[in-house]
Amino acid sequence: MDTPLGSIGMIICFDVEFPEIARTLKLMKAGFMVTVNINMHPYELHHHLFSRCRAMENEIPVMICNRLGTEGEFDFCGDSMVIDATEEILLSLKDKEQVKTVSLPIKQELDPMRSYTANRRADMYDILTK
């Protein structure tokens, strides 16, 4: 989705656990990603790990909006967060409904020695499409 701030890549829930989707959004020039989740206990570690990985490996910020509360047998863990391009968590809302703001560096200075984008080997990806 194109905005005055740049292109936003949208990911829905479980899709954040697959690196190919986030990489495709990065290659389509997404400047940052937004993930809408309904992650529940005991899987809160999953959205932490995968979201931080997607930010780091694609060198773009990731925002996670996760449901909070209980419905039937499901206990949703909340913990919406904003992660910068170096995988640092800038904001975490934990387990309360809150509204907060955070300054997000859209064009962040990154360590060129740790550039996953520059060092990717697309010539080795053929096996992934089989």
Where would I find each of the regions flagged by the language model?
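C-terminal beta-strand edge segments of enzyme domains
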Residues: 67-130
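Active-site beta-loop-alpha substructure in enzyme catalytic cores
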Residues: 1-58, 63-64
